[in-house]
């Protein structure tokens, strides 16, 4: 009998992903309650969502907060004070950092949280956790909340109109769910059934992304709202979040995310989104594990999707030893999840993996 206690939080209480999804707000909240809502959003996000917002957004009494900070203790305290008393619900409109902040604010105020993602770069709208930062914007830790998000409202047309780099990053980050989960749970038959369900979901999502992403990206380029596009969006927002919710620590992060963290020490990589760097990290993980078949499959897919297959595409020179040494040192820190890999890790083995990826031909 397995003795691996885990906490399962499959997902939000309500998830709607279709044109007109915002109207569901009125199915769960009265006008009186929505007149006491706190809306928090970023400048670009609210501009992108403006034409789709429900009438509730303009109700007298609703609080509107334009947010430009981080999910930091001081910013959340300030937002709580600005929200005022007698509020009914927190509604966050934006990307991952904004939604993390709004989630934390909702818990601070003891209110239900409604997520309105305007990009599909992460599963932040789905997951009941926030990444905390200091006031300088440096990541500190993440907090898993005691309750699920109340509602997620995905309006596909808003995401269709977003810059394509965000969808690409979401594809990269969500592909990692499968490739990292199989490292974290090499013997799933010994683990709780929910972990196995999470792994099965990760595999299904991987297949959707490998089979449909090229078409979805083309459809976005042509401004066509299609089944392929909606499937990829749901795979990122709902599927990615569900995997972690079912499997807990057995379906979260391994080497791909550690490589991402290592790359962040180089300032030139800051311009690249989280999921874009994670996608590259999957290639390095595959090289470390000697999985040439996976490396070939993903390199071919990335070239079709326009995800990076080399450090050069992330503006990092493989021959700059000082920079590569910094990346390796950070990636191999004792706290990093790369150490879940069932292989011996040294600076030399990691350097060899980077070089293998750099010269690999699909």
Swiss-Prot record:
Zn(2+) binds at residues 173, 257, 274. InterPro entries: ADH_Fe/GldA (IPR001670), ADH_Fe_CS (IPR018211), Glycerol_DH (IPR016205). One of its GO terms (molecular function) is metal ion binding. Binds 1 zinc ion per subunit. Disruption phenotype: Cells lacking this gene show a consistent change in 2-hydroxyglutarate level. PROSITE patterns: ADH_IRON_1. It catalyses: 2-hydroxybutanoate + NADP(+) = 2-oxobutanoate + NADPH + H(+); 2-hydroxyglutarate + NADP(+) = 2-oxoglutarate + NADPH + H(+). Its cofactor is Zn(2+). Its EC number is 1.1.1.-. Pfam families: Fe-ADH. Keywords: Metal-binding, NADP, Oxidoreductase, Zinc. SUPFAM superfamilies: Dehydroquinate synthase-like. Belongs to the iron-containing alcohol dehydrogenase family. Catalyzes the NADPH-dependent reduction of 2-oxoglutarate and 2-oxobutanoate, leading to the respective 2-hydroxycarboxylate. Cannot use NADH instead of NADPH as a redox partner. Do not catalyze the reverse reactions. This is Hydroxycarboxylate dehydrogenase A.
């Amino acid at each position: 009998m397995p003795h691996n206690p885990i906490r399962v939080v499959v997902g939000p209480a309500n998830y709607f992903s279709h044109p007109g999804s915002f109207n569901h707000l009125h199915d769960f909240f009265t006008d009186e309650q929505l007149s006491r809502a706190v809306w928090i959003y970023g400048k670009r996000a609210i501009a992108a969502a403006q034409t789709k917002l429900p009438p509730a957004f303009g109700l007298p009494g609703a609080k509107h907060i334009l947010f430009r900070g981080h999910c930091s203790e001081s910013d959340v305290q300030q937002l709580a004070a600005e929200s005022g008393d007698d509020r009914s619900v927190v509604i966050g409109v934006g990307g991952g950092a904004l939604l993390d902040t709004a989630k934390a604010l909702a818990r601070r105020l003891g209110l239900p949280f409604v997520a309105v993602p305007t990009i599909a770069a992460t599963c932040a709208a789905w997951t009941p956790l926030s990444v905390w930062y200091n006031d300088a914007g440096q990541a500190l830790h993440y907090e898993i909340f005691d309750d699920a998000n109340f509602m997620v409202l995905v309006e596909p047309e808003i995401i269709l109109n977003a810059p394509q780099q965000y969808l690409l990053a979401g594809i990269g980050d969500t592909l990692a769910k499968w490739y990292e989960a199989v490292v974290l749970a090499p013997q799933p038959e010994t683990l709780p059934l929910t972990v196995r369900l999470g792994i099965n979901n990760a595999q299904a999502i991987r297949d959707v992304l490998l089979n449909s992403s090229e078409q979805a990206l083309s459809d976005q380029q042509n401004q066509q709202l299609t089944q392929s596009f909606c499937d990829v969006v749901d795979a990122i927002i709902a599927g990615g979040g569900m995997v972690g919710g079912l499997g807990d620590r057995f379906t979260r992060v391994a080497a791909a995310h550690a490589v991402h963290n290592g790359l962040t020490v180089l300032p030139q990589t800051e311009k690249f989104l989280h999921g874009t760097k994670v996608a590259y990290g999957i290639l390095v993980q595959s090289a470390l594990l000697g999985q040439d078949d996976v490396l070939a499959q993903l390199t071919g897919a990335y070239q079709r999707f326009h995800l990076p297959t080399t450090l050069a595409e992330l503006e990092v020179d493989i021959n700059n030893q000082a920079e590569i040494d910094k990346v390796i040192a950070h990636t191999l820190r004792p706290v990093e999840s790369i150490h879940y890999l069932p292989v011996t890790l040294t600076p030399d083995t990691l350097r060899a993996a980077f070089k293998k990826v750099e010269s690999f031909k699909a």
